[in-house]
Amino acid sequence: MVTRLVRERIPQRFGINALTDIQVLTPMHRSEVGTEELNRVLQAELQPHLATAEAEGRLLRSRGRRFVVGDKVMQVRNDYDRDVWNGDVGFVTAIDTEEGLMVVRYDDEREVLYDEDALEQLELAYAVSVHKSQGSEYKAVVVPLTLQHYPLLRRNLLYTAVTRGKQLVVLVGDPRALRRAVRESGDLTRYTRLALRLRAILPS
């Protein structure tokens, strides 16, 4: 469902670019709808040349991940030498497999060169954790919620996720998970009408 929303339904209905304008946000890294699995699936769906690039040796690998030209990636630690920072998102524009080099273009049009050792600073960013999304905004946000996320289903996490979307927010998954997230406030109280609005559309 998440892949179809990102690849087809949202772009077709709202004219939003799947690669540059839609961000999947998920509470966890490991699960069927965690960042690791969603990035694997979304990369395969949104980069149709992935299999060919792998067969022809036109990709780079780092920590079990495959990078190809066009990939959406996130810097996951501060790198003062390259002037890139934890949470910066960009797109792979060039790969040199013989030299083990990759170029990433960031939002401000800067192009940053990574060698094979520096690739460990990058992760695929088709899906990112809600925590990593703090401080960012996206045209459209897709948030999968399941009971696999049970320990993390809190109102403040849901609030962070849905307030990242500027134009469109899509919640997809188990209504029971959404009900729990609305109900569980944890230690943080926010005075917004989000919980009331979500309760109004949830089946009782």
Identify the role of each PLM range.
Residues M1-R82, T93, I201:
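Conserved helicase motor core of P-loop NTPases
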